[in-house]
Swiss-Prot record:
Protein name: Uncharacterized membrane protein YubF
Disulfide bonds: none
Membrane protein topology class: Multi-pass membrane protein
Chief place where the protein resides: membrane
Transmembrane segments: 10-30, 43-63
Annotated GO biological process: DNA damage response
Record-level GO cellular component terms: plasma membrane
UniProtKB keywords: Cell membrane, Membrane, Transmembrane, Transmembrane helix
Species classification: Bacteria, Bacillati, Bacillota, Bacilli, Bacillales
UniProt-annotated location(s): Cell membrane
InterPro entries referenced in this protein's UniProt entry, alphabetically: YiaA-like, YiaAB
Amino acid sequence: MQKYRRRNTVAFTVLAYFTFFAGVFLFSIGLYNADNLELNEKGYYIAVMILVAVGAILTQKVTRDNAEDNEIIAEQEKRQNQSHIES
């Protein structure tokens, strides 16, 4: 029986969480320092909002994939343990 391999590496999982939190942090700094919004600041906010959106999507995907992988691995280990007991 082939062992199931996780879809996401630890590095990718950390990067997904980092991207989300970095976007939220940078957006918060920008809001704190915003007095009047000039054109370059509007571009900054658009870029950071895109970063937050991508980070949120990646974080959701990684969390869901990791949860599904844990279920699959647990089921596979259960089957493997049952086959060892039967033989």
